[in-house]
């Protein structure tokens, strides 16, 4: 509920007088309660939004209908009933769930009660006498629709049920009793009709003509024919306010029967009695009233006239809404009188020196803090009392009598021997400077309200204290802003803390030597921090533990339902349980804390507990604010919280209600403070909902629901989910034995209580899961797997902190729970520590323990998982973890998820996000004769072995260790099954794995071999387990070396008879775990025989459906394949490794890549791919800006939780978005965007591709065709003309910077970003490598390490230029005959180019599309080269030095397969038909077909067509010179498979990026799905002239790129910026028009091609008769191959001699053909 106004009675008049005032002058109606009774009033218009309805009632009925209205039978209604003698209100708006209010005040007592109903939009308040409550409905609409009249006491019979929204109201019993003064706002409503009403309505006794009340008295109809007069505000008395002055303000039915003017109720009272008879009063006198607001009081100085009395009397009247407060006090030490209001009751304490006499007076119903006047009289008189003792004689004692309102009286006797009240101090009225320090005071706060006519009288004199204060007597001292009239004092509204995160910050509490705090609280929750404040840790340094450097603190907390006080004044703390019973019972609990120096007391519900602080300090020095209800989020980390305050460390804020907070006797307006601070989760009022919150089963995904205070609490531990209702999937981290996550806390943490929970899954029996570590001590709390059990270790380094020897424990405490937890299933572990108590739970099986010693403080700087990196104080390092961890929550902090989302900046990790297959440290045994020898296996009493293997061989020895006598152990592969053979001295035994099929299937399999101390052997293959019990010998005594993978040949013959292996293992081994030790098989080997190498890439050499994951594109090569991962956000050989990942923290961060001024590219096409995860609904991910002044830009952003792109390349802003994919869910998403001119596509994950085609493309295509015919010398003129005409606004000009993170745009991104790729640039990878062009700023963290460079000198250029690869696996070569060029060696610089045709020069010499450039200049810093034809050995002419400008990043790389080309850019299929229709189309195994395929971008003997246009000018391809009009005659056909031929120009993709995995569609490699009819599937060729790829088109299905990925997801098309499907390819249409003018050229080209084929056939003949030589193809590194193999050429031992030209690279001989 929002903080809103609470109903209070109107000012000036107390409720009783208000009742009388409202009833006066208005007719009363008597309802008989008979059938058919009703009253109908005019419609209450104020009920629609804001308004008040009030009336008075008197009844003895327990159930009846009072009021009803509705909207005519639709949704809204308001109903006021009597239920069980109490008022119940129900209402609703807009068909929302009805709200219900049930008041506690009984009204069926046949007495008058005042009712006020207040409407305020969705909120309605109901008040009866002094009780008020409010409720609110959760409706869409704020206003209530009111269509009916106001029905009172019943429903007329003519109202149909269908016209009633709440039809049951018609069957409620009619009201029986009196109802008077019904008002809507300030006016009575018009009575439209009635039935069954009697008496009062017909006799207007209080009408002006008959009003009997004189002097302005208020007339009230009490009963038929009977009236009463309220004279309280007139100054007169009597039945009709006509007799002199009345002594006090009060209702007409009060009796004056005291000789000193004390007033007593003879009947009734507000909320308790009816209107009784008015007795004849004595002569009135002037009243002396004062208002106290908590900080005011006055005192009379008795030092000059001390009191010595034996008989005395105190009288006063009070009116308040406050439950606690000091009204009067005199005396000190052991001689005093104290009169207070405590919990709404009057409390009297008298001590005459021998002990205190206490009396408590409570009303029968309600409380005295009802804002009505109450009169108190205290007397002490001498009485004779029969004593009981030795003498059994009568003694004189003093009788003490206290009466409140004349009828509530308590009597008692003071202690004997002390009869005189002596006081020479002060007479305090309404409060004191320090109420908590007054002797005998049951309260610690001053009075708030009105006090009137305070008089003290004894035998000798009379002190009219109120009069003396008003008249300014010199002996009277006034404190504060006293007002000598009765004013309304706002009640201290309670507040509700609705969540553990809610808190209110109070001003700093200055309580150095003395102080007091009192409050009431109410909750049902067992734990919570109520109050907390602390001082500065004076002189504290790192690692300081001296007691002199302790910080002072004060706290109150609830633990397990008990209230605890915690106090430390710098010399030692105390922790005191203040309540003897649990106080979380949902009832109000009053707490009163008082301190004076080291001494003090805390009282809980009047049960006081004294305390004495330890040490010598008496000063409590608090520097921080005083926090109520909890701590701020930042304060939990930044403040060095005292470890003794357990709820602070556990982040357990208080949930419940708090009221009446007084600090040092002064009130604190909690509601006002909460409103001023905008406190989240702090609501006004306090109500306890009776409905069970868990009844609706709100917890999802198996979460356990428990009831809280007006809330439910979901326990998500063990579910794999987090969040309020377990709705958010917890982050999973995968560990391979070398990975970790480390939380490096900003400050050293000291705790005495911890709650830790996590889930794990592992196949290893050993491994560290979580540990706290300290840089300065051996303190640790560690969870690890130990022999398949969960082991908890808690070590508290007592010696390190200098604690007393008696406090030291016996050493680390350990607990074990669970068994066989290494079953590759999810398990849940939880640790709960409270001081010395330990609790370890695994899968709901709990083990408890108790720590020895008094020292309980745990110090830590780090929380580590996977690997324990802080090892200075540990003797035995736990084994590294291999497996998966999830849902790590440490003291309320979900660190894994916070680390992933960037919520914390002190996280370091290289573990991989997501549930990934784990293969740790794989090694490959290349031959059966290869093996390793390690140190002896230690397996004497027990053993736990684990490893993974992958092979195609059916047999082989995996592990062998011999021992003393006949002891040995063997693990081997026999006919595809695992055998475990062992001998412990009882003879050899064999166990065979029961896998359902042979395991030599080239898949990874997991093997677990264990033996427990009970001699139970276990063999587990994947998920299938075999066990065997052995008798006899229990120990395995091994010696000698442990052999892995095989043995020497002469040793096989000596193996025991049950061992079948006669050869070694050939395949891969990984994740080898030897009893908790993870050896590095190669580094730790004592001997390594044969070919044993790191890594395991498998034997596959052909692109298959599973070759590349995450939509990576398989690129077939001569002896293998590589995966192009550029548009996946992943890396690695098969696109399954995380791309370079950065986590952007809360404060925002920015990564900026800036092109050098001379190398700024201008592009007509752009490719962007990025992976990310976030919970933000609005942020900017990536932005690319052009140079200053141009205004071109491209921006990828998140808006309302969805991804969108906006770009501008010179025209208007163009937007494209994906509204269906919500990406703000914290999961990993991959976005792919492509742009070609104004066309754009956007794809999120596997959602369908969104495409956008701005109008006007057709004109642009035609102009592009025409542009190619213009000679170079006129090209600039035409470009300027086109620019003037607005035709060339499709180019992203002069790109200057790429900015990642959105910090500069005011919409910073928070989360992780992986594998970003933009036009050949991998900016995140460059940032990780500290590239000089990259700048980082803000809260940024690199996950793991940056990508390593695995490229040789020969393959660096090849891999970096994988972006230029076409990605289909069918390829032919088109040979150009119009240009002669000569190549240079692949130096990653610009190639030298010479053109002989102006037409071609115009299109090819200047590839830049930047129309702002004045001339075409060669670039000296470019990293890409132009592929050329090596045709002659002549040096290039001087003109060749003017090579085209080539921007460093490629701006042309196709998105996956066909996505890089539009219809504008592609040659029609007819242009490719001659190449694809030759004799080598169907079968490509023949060498004659393979020989000509020598296409590359690196001048290594490849043939290219120089007539192709610049890279980013896609329009040029429409005039490809080999095009014929046969395109339109082709019928769709399936492309011929060529599995062993790689794609042109691509030798590999940079498979070294790291990024989290994400599911992706699974499509067959090499198969294309064409979206549009006759659409060619051709990638953009490399920069400069290249070789187009011929591929047969298919009509029916939509275009699908040839991608490979993991299965299980829909096969959806990827982005492809092509024209709309209903339009024919414009390029083909335009080319047909040109064909008649190029017939001669085509004939020449065909003739030249035939000549080339003859020459090549001859060359192949020579090639096949060469000396073959011998060579071995290493299949373990297919992603790094030499360029000759990459281009389909056959590797020769001896290349034919050729002229030495710059185009020759080492080990890569060029084969040159001359045409």
UniProtKB/Swiss-Prot annotation:
Single Gene Ontology MF annotation: metal ion binding
Superkingdom per UniProt: Eukaryota
Extracellular domain ranges by topology: 30-1639
CDD domains on file: EGF_CA, LamG
Gene3D superfamilies: 2.60.120.200, Laminin
Keywords: Calcium, Cell adhesion, Cell membrane, Cell projection, Disulfide bond, EGF-like domain, Glycoprotein, Heparan sulfate, Membrane, Metal-binding, Proteoglycan, Repeat, Signal, Synapse, Transmembrane, Transmembrane helix
Positions of the EGF-like domain: 202-242, 690-727, 1099-1136
Stretches the record annotates as Disordered: 1461-1511, 1529-1549, 1583-1626, 1682-1715
Domain Laminin G-like residues, every copy: 30-206, 289-486, 493-686, 732-907, 921-1096, 1140-1348
Residues given in the record as Ca(2+) 3 binding sites: 1192, 1209, 1291, 1293
Tissue expression: Brain (neuronal synapse).
Name of the featured protein: Neurexin-2
């Amino acid at each position: 509920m929002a903080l809103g106004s609470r109903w209070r009675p109107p000012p000036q008049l107390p409720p009783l007088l208000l009742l009388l005032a409202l009833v006066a002058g208005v007719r009363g109606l008597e309802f008989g309660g008979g059938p058919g009774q009703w009253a109908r009033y005019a419609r209450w218009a104020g009920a629609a939004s804001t308004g008040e309805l009030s009336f008075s009632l008197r009844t003895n009925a327990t159930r009846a209908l009072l009021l009803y209205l509705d909207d005519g039978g639709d949704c809204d209604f308001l109903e006021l009933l009597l239920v069980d003698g109490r008022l119940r209100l129900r209402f609703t708006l807009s068909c929302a769930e009805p709200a219900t209010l049930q008041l506690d005040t009984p009204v069926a007592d046949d007495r008058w009660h005042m009712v006020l109903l207040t409407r305020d939009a969705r909120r309605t308040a109901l008040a009866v006498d002094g009780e008020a409550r409010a409720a609110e409905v959760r409706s869409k609409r704020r206003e209530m629709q009111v269509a009916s009249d106001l029905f009172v006491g019943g429903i007329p019979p003519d109202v149909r049920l269908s016209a009633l929204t709440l039809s049951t109201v018609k069957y409620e019993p009619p009201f029986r009793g009196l109802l008077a003064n019904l008002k809507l706002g300030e006016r009575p409503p018009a009575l439209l009709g009635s039935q069954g009403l009697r008496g009062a309505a017909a006799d207007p006794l209080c009408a002006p003509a008959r009003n009997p009340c004189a002097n302005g008295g208020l007339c009230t109809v009490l009963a038929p024919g009977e009236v009463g007069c309220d004279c309280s505000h007139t100054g007169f008395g009597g039945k009709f306010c006509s007799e002199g002055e009345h002594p006090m303000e009060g209702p007409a039915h009060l009796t004056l029967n005291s000789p000193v003017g004390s007033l007593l109720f003879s009947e009734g009272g507000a909320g308790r009695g009816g209107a009784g008879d008015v007795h004849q009063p004595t002569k009135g006198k002037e009243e002396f009233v004062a208002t106290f607001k908590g900080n005011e009081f006055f005192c009379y100085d008795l030092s000059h006239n001390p009191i010595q009395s034996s008989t005395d009397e105190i009288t006063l009247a009070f009116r308040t809404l406050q439950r606690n407060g000091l009204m009067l006090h005199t005396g000190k030490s052991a001689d005093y009188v104290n009169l207070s209001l405590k919990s709404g009751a009057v409390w009297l304490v008298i001590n005459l020196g021998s002990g205190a006499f206490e009396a408590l007076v409570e009303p029968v119903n309600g409380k005295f803090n009802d804002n009505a006047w109450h009169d108190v009289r205290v007397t002490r008189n001498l009485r004779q009392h029969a004593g009981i003792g030795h003498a059994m004689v009568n003694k004189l004692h003093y009788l003490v009598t206290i009466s409140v309102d004349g009828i509530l009286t308590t009597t008692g006797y003071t202690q004997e021997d002390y009869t005189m009240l002596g006081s020479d101090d002060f007479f305090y009225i309404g409060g004191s400077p320090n109420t908590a320090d007054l002797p005998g005071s049951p309260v610690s706060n001053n009075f708030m309200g009105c006090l009137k006519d305070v008089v003290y009288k004894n035998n000798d004199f009379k002190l009219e204290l109120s009069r003396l204060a008003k008249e300014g007597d010199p002996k009277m001292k006034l404190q504060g802003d006293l007002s000598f009239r009765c004013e309304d004092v706002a009640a201290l509204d309670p507040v509700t803390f609705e969540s553990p995160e809610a808190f209110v910050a109070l001003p700093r509490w200055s309580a150095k030597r003395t102080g007091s705090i009192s409050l009431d609280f109410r909750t049902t929750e067992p734990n919570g921090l109520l109050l907390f404040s602390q001082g500065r840790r004076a002189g504290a340094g790192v690692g300081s533990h001296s007691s002199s450097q302790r910080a002072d603190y004060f706290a109150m907390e609830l633990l397990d339902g008990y209230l605890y006080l915690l106090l430390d004044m710098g010399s030692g703390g105390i922790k005191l349980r203040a309540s003897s019973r649990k106080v979380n019972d949902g009832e109000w609990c009053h707490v009163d804390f008082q301190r004076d120096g080291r001494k003090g007391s805390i009282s809980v519900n009047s049960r006081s507990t004294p305390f004495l602080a330890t040490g010598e300090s008496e000063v409590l020095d608090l520097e921080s604010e005083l926090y109520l209800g909890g701590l701020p989020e930042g304060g939990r980390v930044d403040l060095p919280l005292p470890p003794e305050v357990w709820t602070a460390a556990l982040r357990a804020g208080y949930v419940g209600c708090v009221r009446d907070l007084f600090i040092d006797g002064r009130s604190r307006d909690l509601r006002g403070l909460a409103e001023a601070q905008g406190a989240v989760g702090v609501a006004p009022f306090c109500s306890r909902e009776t409905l069970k919150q868990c009844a609706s089963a709100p917890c999802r995904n198996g979460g356990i629901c428990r009831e809280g205070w007006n809330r439910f609490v979901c326990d998500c531990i063990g579910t794999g989910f987090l969040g309020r209702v377990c709705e958010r999937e917890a982050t999973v981290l995968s560990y391979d034995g070398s990975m970790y996550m480390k939380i490096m806390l900003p400050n050293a943490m000291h705790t005495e209580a911890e709650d830790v929970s996590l889930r794990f899954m592992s196949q290893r029996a050993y491994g560290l899961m979580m540990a706290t570590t300290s840089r300065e001590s051996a303190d640790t709390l560690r969870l690890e797997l130990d022999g398949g059990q969960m082991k908890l270790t808690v070590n508290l380094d007592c010696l390190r902190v200098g604690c007393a020897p008696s406090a030291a424990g016996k050493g680390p405490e350990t607990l074990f729970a669970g068994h066989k937890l290494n079953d590759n299933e999810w398990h849940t572990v939880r640790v709960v520590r409270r001081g010395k108590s330990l609790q370890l739970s695994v899968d709901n099986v709990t083990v408890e323990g108790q720590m020895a010693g008094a020292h309980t403080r745990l110090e830590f700087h780090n929380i580590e998982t996977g690997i324990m990196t802080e090892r200075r104080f540990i003797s035995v390092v736990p084994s590294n973890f291999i497996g998966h961890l999830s849902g790590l929550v440490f003291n309320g902090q979900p660190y894994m998820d916070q680390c992933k989302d960037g919520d914390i900046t002190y996280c370091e990790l290289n573990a991989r996000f997501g549930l990934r297959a784990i293969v740790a440290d794989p090694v490959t045994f290349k031959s059966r004769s290869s093996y390793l020898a390690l140190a002896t296996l230690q397996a004497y009493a027990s053993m736990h072995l684990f490893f993974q293997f992958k092979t195609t061989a059916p047999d082989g020895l995996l592990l062998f260790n011999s021992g003393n006598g006949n002891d040995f152990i063997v693990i081997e592969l026999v006919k595809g099954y695992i055998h475990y053979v062992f001998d412990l001295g009882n003879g050899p035994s064999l166990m065979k794995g029961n896998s359902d099929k042979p395991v030599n299937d080239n898949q990874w399999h997991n093997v677990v071999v264990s033996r427990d101390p009970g001699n139970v052997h276990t063999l587990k293959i994947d998920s299938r387990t075999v066990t065997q019990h052995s008798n006899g010998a229990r120990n395995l005594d091994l010696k000698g070396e442990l052999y892995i993978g095989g043995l020497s040949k002469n040793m096989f013959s000596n193996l025991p008879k049950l061992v079948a292996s006669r050869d070694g293992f050939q395949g891969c081994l990984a994740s080898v775990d030897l009893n908790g030790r993870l050896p590095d098989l190669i580094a730790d080997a004592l001997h390594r025989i044969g070919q044993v190498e790191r890594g395991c890439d498998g034997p596959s050499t052909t692109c298959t459906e599973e070759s590349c994951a995450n939509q990576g594109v398989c690129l077939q090569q001569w002896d293998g394949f590589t995966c192009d991962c550029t548009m996946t956000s992943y890396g690695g050989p098969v696109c399954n490794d995380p791309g370079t990942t950065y986590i952007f923290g809360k404060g925002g961060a920015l990564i900026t890549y800036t092109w050098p001024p001379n190398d700024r590219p201008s592009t007509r096409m752009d490719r962007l791919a990025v992976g990310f995860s976030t919970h933000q609904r609005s942020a900017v991910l990536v932005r690319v800006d052009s140079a200053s002044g141009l205004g071109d830009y491209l921006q990828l952003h998140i808006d309302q939780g969805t991804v969108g792109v906006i770009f501008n390349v010179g025209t208007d802003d163009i937007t494209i978005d994906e509204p269906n994919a919500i990406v703000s869910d914290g999961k990993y998403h991959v976005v792919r965007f492509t742009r070609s001119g104004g066309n754009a596509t956007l794809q999120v994950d596997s959602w369908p591709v969104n495409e956008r085609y701005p109008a006007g493309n057709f004109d642009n295509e035609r102009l592009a065709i025409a542009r190619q015919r213009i000679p170079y010398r006129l090209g600039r003129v035409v470009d300027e003309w086109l620019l003037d005409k607005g035709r060339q606004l499709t180019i992203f000009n002069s790109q200057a910077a790429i900015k990642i993170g959105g910090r500069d745009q005011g919409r910073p991104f928070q989360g992780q970003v992986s594998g970003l790729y933009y036009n050949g640039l991998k900016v995140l990878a460059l940032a990780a490598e500290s590239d000089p062009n990259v700048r980082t700023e803000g809260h940024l963290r690199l996950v793991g390490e940056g990508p390593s460079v695995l490229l040789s000198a020969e393959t660096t250029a090849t891999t970096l230029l994988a972006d230029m690869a076409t990605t289909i696996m069918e390829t032919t070569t088109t040979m150009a005959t119009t240009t002669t060029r000569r190549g240079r060696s692949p130096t990653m610089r610009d190639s030298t180019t010479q053109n002989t045709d102006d037409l071609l020069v115009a299109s090819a010499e200047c590839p830049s599309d930047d129309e702002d450039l004045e001339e075409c200049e060669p670039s000296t810093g470019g990293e890409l080269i132009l592929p050329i034809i090596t045709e002659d050995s002549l040096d290039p002419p001087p003109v060749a030095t003017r090579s085209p400008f080539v921007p460093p990043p490629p701006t042309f790389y196709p998105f996956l397969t066909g996505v890089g080309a539009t219809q504008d850019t592609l040659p029609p299929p007819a242009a490719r038909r001659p190449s694809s229709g030759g004799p080598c189309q169907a079968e490509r195994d023949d060498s004659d077909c393979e020989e000509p395929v020598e296409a590359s971008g690196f001048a290594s003997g490849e043939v290219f067509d120089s007539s192709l246009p610049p890279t980013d000018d896609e329009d040029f391809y429409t005039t490809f010179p080999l095009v014929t009009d046969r395109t339109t005659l082709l019928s769709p056909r399936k492309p011929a498979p060529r599995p062993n031929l790689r794609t042109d120009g691509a030798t590999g993709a940079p498979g070294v990026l790291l990024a989290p995995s994400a599911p992706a569609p699974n499509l067959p490699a090499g198969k294309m799905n064409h979206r549009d009819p006759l659409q060619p599937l051709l990638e953009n060729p490399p920069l400069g002239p290249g070789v187009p790829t011929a591929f047969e088109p298919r009509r029916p299905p939509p275009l699908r790129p040839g991608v490979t990925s993991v299965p299980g997801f829909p096969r959806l098309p990827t982005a492809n910026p092509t024209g709309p499907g209903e339009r024919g390819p414009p390029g083909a249409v335009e080319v047909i028009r040109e064909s008649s003018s190029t017939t001669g050229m085509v004939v020449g080209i065909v003739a030249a091609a035939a000549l080339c084929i003859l020459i090549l056939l001859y060359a192949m003949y020579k090639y096949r008769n060469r000396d073959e030589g011998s060579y071995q193809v290493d299949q373990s590194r297919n992603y790094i191959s030499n360029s000759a193999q990459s281009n389909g050429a056959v590797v020769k031992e001896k290349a034919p001699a050729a002229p030495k030209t710059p185009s020759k690279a080492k080990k890569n001989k060029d084969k040159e053909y001359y045409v």
